[in-house]
């Protein structure tokens, strides 16, 4: 029985050897096919280099692209049996070689001279676009937006005209412009075409302390402290406006009594506030903050002349000046109350002086209302409104001009139409201007109305003309407002959101061979782990089992071979990345990949030879064990021999 079992085990061993030989033959055929493909690709690159050399020597354009038969069959033969020569075709332009660009699977073809028009861009610079070159497919690959590349390629073909496709969002196209490195000039031109007005660059102070103070008061978004300062400024502005309105209430007014005659008195409002007045004290606190803010901003500004020319700073100055004039008036009245000798003044001069001073004080108090425009520094809505009015000055001028023509025309018409009526409200043409303005703006107070039939007809025509006149320029003003509003919101969204698009995976030097090495290395290591798990989980296979001792050297050899391969891979990657990409041509890149793949094949062959030697030693050991088992007649040893043979064959198959 033992001899039969040994013969049965040898038969299985032969079958496994046969399968192993078939697998090795299949692997050898695959390697030969890969080598043929590499030779063909290398031949293509050599032909392309020869074409470029001929072009540089002869001064002509590039050669026409070879046919597939010429590329695959090497150097073709002409009709006479000799080698066929490709003569360059004369051109008027250089760089007529066609370039294939693959954008997410969509292939584009263009001429090299088209891309070379913009050498500072990604596609125009040979060193930069070489990172994305695939030598096996002989094309450049970009994993980017396909619809956007139509406009990018048209930018090169048209000589610098950039047009965004309708189906591409604005943010996506902006990212594509940045990726292809078209430059700041192209980006600014694109933003102008899309309606984004280029904002003027606001310089910062050179001194570090001045820069911090300037950012603190001028840019509320720069820090948390700047936001606090902005909130305080807004609160003080609102408080001053509320005080300005509340002090005009009758219960808060101050009155003076004047003796006009012997038995007559006159009561008038006191235009000069008292120093102890609560409103005046609050106004003083607000002015202290406004003055402090304006002074600090002036001292920290980078350009004093531009600071004085700014409209917002002029408004700040106008909002402060009335207080100091009022304060000077209060101090002057306090001096008048003192019993000091004064020159006699006539009653007429005194009344005229009082009227003049009251008029000046009222104008000064009116100027305080301009403080409300200080809110525009902290309000995006007011800034948009100001930009809209500034951009619509022409339309507003046309509106006022049309209203002026209508007012003159219809006020004259209604005056002559109502001239014969006894109860007419229109005493003169200038007196009818008010009625024409109120009617054309469709307000209609009713204080002046036509009485006669002809006057009513003129009033009807005036109302219709006013509706048409006002309605014509209003849509243009509204469209300007929508434009500035959407532009502001789009800019805020682009600044607040970070668009994380899929970036291209460039073909860096050596990446083609490294991927194959890493995959083969991971597969071999996973196979070793599975083999080790299988050995440990095999029933009856203990540490003293002969199968364990036969497998252990093989696993140790594989682990020792894995470490130098991984270290050599990392060293080769580091060395290749240290070389400047500008000095690598397509031929050098491919030659490096060929050398790496050749080293991989040599290592694989050495590993295969070592494995075969180990298997031969294991087979001789198992044959000796089977012979010993046959002589002893032990059934258990025959079973052990079969188990060892099966284990050795499984090891050889996995390798």
UniProtKB/Swiss-Prot annotation:
Keyword list, A-Z: Behavior, Cell membrane, Cell projection, Glycoprotein, Ion channel, Ion transport, Membrane, Potassium, Potassium channel, Potassium transport, Transmembrane, Transmembrane helix, Transport, Voltage-gated channel
Stretches assigned to coiled coil: none
Activity regulation summary: Inhibited by 4-aminopyridine (4-AP).
Compartment(s): Cell membrane; Membrane raft; Cell projection, Neuron projection; Perikaryon
GO molecular function: delayed rectifier potassium channel activity; voltage-gated monoatomic cation channel activity; voltage-gated potassium channel activity
Tissue and organ expression note: Expressed in mushroom body (at protein level); this overlaps with expression of qvr/quiver/sleepless and nicotinic acetylcholine receptor (nAChRs) proteins also involved in sleep regulation. Expressed in the adult brain. Enriched in the mushroom body, anterior optic tubercle, superior protocerebrum, antennal nerve and visual projection neuron fibers projecting into the lobula plate of the optic lobe.
Topology in the lipid bilayer: Multi-pass membrane protein
Biased composition (Basic and acidic residues): 26-47
Record-given protein name: Potassium voltage-gated channel protein Shaker
């Amino acid at each position: 029985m033992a001899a039969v079992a040994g013969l049965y085990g040898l038969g299985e061993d032969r079958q496994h050897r046969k399968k192993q030989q078939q697998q090795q033959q299949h692997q050898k055929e695959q390697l030969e096919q890969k080598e043929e493909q590499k030779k063909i690709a290398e031949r293509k690159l050599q032909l392309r280099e020869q074409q470029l050399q001929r072009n540089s020597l002869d001064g002509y354009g590039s050669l026409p692209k070879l046919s597939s038969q010429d590329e695959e069959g090497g150097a073709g033969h002409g009709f006479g049996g000799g080698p066929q020569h490709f003569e360059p075709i004369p051109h008027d332009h250089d760089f007529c070689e066609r370039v294939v660009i693959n954008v997410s699977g969509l292939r584009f073809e263009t001429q090299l001279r088209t891309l070379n028009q913009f050498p500072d861009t990604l596609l125009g610079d040979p060193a930069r676009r070489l990172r994305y070159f695939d030598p096996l497919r002989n094309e450049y690959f970009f994993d980017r937006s396909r619809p956007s590349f139509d406009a990018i390629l048209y930018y090169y073909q048209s000589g610098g005209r950039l047009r965004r496709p309708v189906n591409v969002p604005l943010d996506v196209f902006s990212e594509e412009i940045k990726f292809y490195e078209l430059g700041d000039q192209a980006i600014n031109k694109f933003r102008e075409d899309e309606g984004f007005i280029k904002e003027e660059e606001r310089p910062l102070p050179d001194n570090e302390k001045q820069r911090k103070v300037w950012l603190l008061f001028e840019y509320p978004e720069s820090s948390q402290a700047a936001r606090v300062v902005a909130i305080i400024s807004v609160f003080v502005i609102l408080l001053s406006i509320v005080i300005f309105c509340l002090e005009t209430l009758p219960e808060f007014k101050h009155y003076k009594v004047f003796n006009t005659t012997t038995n007559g008195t006159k009561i008038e409002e006191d235009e000069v506030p008292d120093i102890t007045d609560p409103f005046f004290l609050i106004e003083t606190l607000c002015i202290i903050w406004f003055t402090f803010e304006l002074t600090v901003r002036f001292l920290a500004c980078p350009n004093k002349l531009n600071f004085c020319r700014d409209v917002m700073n002029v408004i700040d100055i106008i909002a402060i000046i009335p207080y100091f004039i009022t304060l000077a008036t209060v101090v002057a009245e306090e001096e008048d109350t003192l019993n000091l000798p004064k020159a006699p003044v006539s009653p007429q001069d005194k009344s005229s002086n009082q009227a003049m001073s009251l008029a000046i004080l009222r104008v000064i108090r009116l100027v305080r209302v301009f403080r409300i425009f200080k809110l525009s520094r902290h309000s995006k809505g007011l800034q948009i409104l100001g930009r809209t009015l500034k951009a619509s000055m022409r339309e507003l001028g046309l509106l006022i001009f049309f209203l002026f023509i209508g007012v003159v025309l219809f006020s004259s018409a209604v005056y002559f139409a109502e001239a014969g009526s006894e109860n007419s409200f229109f005493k003169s043409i200038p007196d009818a201007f008010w009625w024409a303005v109120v009617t054309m703006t469709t307000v209609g107070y009713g204080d002046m109305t036509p009485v006669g039939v002809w006057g009513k007809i003129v009033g009807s025509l005036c109302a219709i003309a006013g509706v048409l006149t006002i309605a014509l320029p209003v849509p243009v003003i509204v469209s300007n407002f929508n434009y500035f509003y959407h532009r502001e919101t789009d800019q805020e969204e682009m600044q607040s959101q970070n668009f994380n698009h899929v970036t291209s995976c460039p073909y860096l030097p050596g990446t083609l061979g490294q991927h194959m090495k890493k995959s083969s290395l991971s597969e071999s290591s996973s196979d070793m782990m599975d083999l080790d798990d299988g050995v440990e989980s095999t029933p009856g296979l203990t540490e003293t089992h002969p199968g364990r001792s036969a497998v252990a050297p093989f696993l140790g050899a594989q682990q020792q071979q894995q470490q130098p391969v991984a270290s050599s891979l990392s060293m080769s990657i580091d060395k290749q990345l240290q070389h400047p990409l500008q000095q690598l041509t397509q031929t050098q890149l491919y030659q490096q990949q060929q050398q790496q793949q050749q080293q991989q094949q040599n290592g694989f062959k050495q590993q295969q030879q070592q494995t075969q030697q180990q298997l031969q030693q294991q087979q001789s050991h198992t044959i000796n064990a089977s012979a010993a088992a046959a002589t002893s007649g032990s059934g258990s040893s025959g079973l052990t021999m079969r188990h060892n043979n099966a284990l050795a064959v499984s090891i050889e198959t996995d390798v």
